[in-house]
């Protein structure tokens, strides 16, 4: 059985991951409305990955005899006017998620909950990758986004991204 505080934080993280999926689906909708199907594809896959993260956390709680407590998912803002605003909001959100994961990790460390720390290692590594990807998207957009041909090529590159389920889900 997990410590109550860890269980509460993990349940909250499930909700944050589901909100992330909801947010990225909103980004995908906006980008698709703008004719940027490649960018939309990239965020649609991000949404799928965030849902996977929620399921991985859910499975961990269940495996440790903790009741999963889902909460309301707030509607994400849809006020983004430019692609760069969306990309920047994506990076800011990933930084928020990283801080949340780090907080849970810190609590697990303080409680000497090594099992949870080991489990969270996956998420710590994942967040490094997520922040790098978000930064790379911003850099590529800045480099190519103002040129129609460059934007076309970048959009096509992003359209080729394919969803691969997390090994943490397929291993269960």
Regions inferred by a protein language model and the residue ranges of each:
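Iron-associated oxidoreductase/ferritin-like identity signal
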Residues: 1-172
